[in-house]
């Protein structure tokens, strides 16, 4: 059976990407990163819950604490507040410098070891916070780098099934593939109840509302 590494944060987008990979006939090898983010424990729980749901035993949980040493992002630096006043133009302080580049590099190492032919990542360019490492152009360049820096027989395709979808279309796609959205976690700030006001919560809530579907995770405010 063909194999695919899935970068699985436990959020709605990456989980939907995992279910798409499964529907396309891949044996899923999930990779999760603990990078000292504010919601590290809650994201890890979501990851494990989703892996349990899919009966995935071969899981990679990789600790990369150096993001906290680098700082420069509200997700890893407690001295930088997570914005709660709505999604605005420009790159927000929740951007973690080159995070997806580092994630993809590690995922490529796992893929080469496991003999996987694809890496799935749930990046979204169209309806998102505007991170530069979530664009289709960036992913295409990373794929070139991965295949030029691995063994000649290694040929990995980086798949981004959601990159051009709006959030409401991602919600609808998730429902189509029977994704357990109630197990996913998107909030940047909280680990008990989603805050409802950070960029990630706002984008998620907007997506559910426009899709006409109820979001069953607990929110502090909506």
UniProtKB/Swiss-Prot annotation:
GO-annotated molecular function: ATP binding; ligase activity, forming carbon-nitrogen bonds; zinc ion binding
Cofactor descriptive note: Binds 1 zinc ion per subunit.
Pathway field: Purine metabolism; 7-cyano-7-deazaguanine biosynthesis
InterPro entries to which the protein is assigned, alphabetical: QueC, Rossmann-like_a/b/a_fold
The UniProt record lists the keyword Manganese: no
EC number(s) on file: 6.3.4.20
Claim: Nucleotidyltransferase is one of the keywords in the record: no
Annotated residues for binding of Zn(2+): 187, 195, 198, 201
Primary enzyme class: ligase
This protein's UniProt keywords: ATP-binding, Ligase, Metal-binding, Nucleotide-binding, Queuosine biosynthesis, Zinc
Residues that bind ATP: 8-18
Catalytic activity: 7-carboxy-7-deazaguanine + NH4(+) + ATP = 7-cyano-7-deazaguanine + ADP + phosphate + H2O + H(+)
Any one Gene Ontology BP term: queuosine biosynthetic process
Known cofactor(s): Zn(2+)
Family: Belongs to the QueC family.
Function recorded in the entry: Catalyzes the ATP-dependent conversion of 7-carboxy-7-deazaguanine (CDG) to 7-cyano-7-deazaguanine (preQ(0)).
HAMAP family the UniProt entry points to: QueC (MF_01633)
Protein name: 7-cyano-7-deazaguanine synthase
Organism: Nautilia profundicola (strain ATCC BAA-1463 / DSM 18972 / AmH)
Encoding gene per record: queC
